[in-house]
């Protein structure tokens, strides 16, 4: 494999005109410890948070020493979903800036429409035929 970057998964969801972006992938260019992944929306940097992730599979395929933290997991919450025209994922590395992903409004809306909604349920209330309640903590 001779690729230096790849996006494994993009999840976009919208709630109350806020876009929630979760992007997972890997990048092997430049000095690994200097990677700063970030999101740009309509030409302006948006608040985002990322963490580095070990990707032993990719390190092995690229003949890199094992344990390199070349994977990334990025999350960003962006206000004004309806007005967003473009979204970019970029990386700063050793003084250089590189585009990893770019989506236009149509791409964003298509991914939002296809992203499954996840719910975390912490309690269920069961009511039997006699009207008695039973609470179940999950």
Give the positions of each predicted feature.
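Basic, ligand-binding patches in group-transfer machinery
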Residues: 1-138
